[in-house]
Design a protein with these regions (language model features):
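Extracytoplasmic/periplasmic sensory segments of membrane signal-transduction proteins
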Residues: 60-118
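Surface-exposed loop/edge segments in extracytoplasmic proteins
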Residues: 107-108, 194-200
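Juxtamembrane extracytoplasmic/periplasmic/luminal helical "stalk" adjacent to the first N-terminal
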Residues: 8-78
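The feature marks either
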Residues: 98, 132, 188-191
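Short, Lys/Arg-rich, polar N-terminal cytosolic tail immediately upstream
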Residues: 1-9
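Extracellular/periplasmic juxtamembrane segments that couple receptor/chemosensory ectodomains to their
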Residues: 200-236
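Conserved beta-strands of PAS-like sensory domains
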Residues: 143-181, 188-192, 197, 227-233
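Extracytoplasmic/periplasmic ligand-binding sensor regions of membrane-associated signaling proteins
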Residues: 90, 104, 108-164
Length: 236
């Protein structure tokens, strides 16, 4: 009788151990699957955010590229004649703050201010340029210190003549770069060696990542810019 009781107790103990192990394995598998699913979902949201920002900015810059054929011939005209077409083109391109005509390195006509006589290098040290140039900078004329995105199209071999289109990127920042907490903690636009950070303006270096963060970057296939998105790392 005692032997039978020991067998029953041994069986119950083994069954309890097996059930406990099965429960622990099930819990671990459930948590692992949930963690992987959550990580994949976060990565998907990060990629979708970056794709949306790149596509949106591509859509802003493409009309400028197409419209340069309208603007470049205006360089042959005096400002008194070219000013009205400049204003109309700026109004048509709703994201453009202003358009300027540059002749021999001198900004001589602006869609906002009309006739001017200012060396373009005084306003933007990187201009004029021999080739097409996209650059991040700050406004030195209208809303001083505010972020701007400049698209430059040269019209002469030496780059001294050209068209400067200024995109009001400050107004687009909320649409493009506003973080979506908690999956996305920060986002930035990089053009050349400068970066536009949401809430911080134009800076020369991206902030260092925290130890529990990682950064995803996506570059445009059509224009020289990159969107960077930061958020919790996969291990968090």
């Amino acid at each position: 009788m005692q032997t039978a009781q020991r067998i029953i107790n041994h069986y119950r103990r083994n069954r309890f151990i097996v059930c406990t192990i099965c429960a622990l394995v099930t819990l671990i598998l459930t948590l692992s699957i949930r963690f992987i699913s959550e990580r994949n979902l976060n990565h998907h949201r990060t990629v979708a955010f970056a794709n949306h920002a790149v596509d949106a900015l591509d859509n802003v810059l493409h009309p400028l590229q197409v419209g340069r054929n309208v603007l470049l011939p205006l360089l042959e005209l005096p400002c008194a004649t070219a000013h009205l077409p400049l204003r109309k083109q700026a109004a048509r391109l709703q994201t453009v703050r202003s358009i300027g005509l540059v002749k021999e390195g001198i900004l001589y006509c602006s869609s906002i201010f009309g006739a001017r006589n200012t060396p373009i290098r005084q306003l933007q040290p990187d201009l004029p340029a021999v080739g097409d140039l996209l650059l991040l900078s700050t406004d030195q004329s209208l809303l001083k210190g505010s972020p701007i995105l400049i698209q430059w199209y040269p019209a002469s071999a030496d780059g001294q003549d050209g068209v400067m289109e200024i995109v009001n990127i400050d107004l687009l920042t909320t649409m493009l770069l506003e973080p979506q907490q908690p999956q996305i903690t920060s986002a930035s636009l990089t053009v050349g060696k400068r970066h536009l950070l949401y809430g911080r303006g134009v800076v020369d270096t991206l902030p260092e990542l925290k130890k529990d963060e990682e950064r995803y970057q996506l570059s445009s296939r059509h224009f020289p810019f990159t969107i960077s998105v930061s958020g919790p790392s996969a291990g968090v």
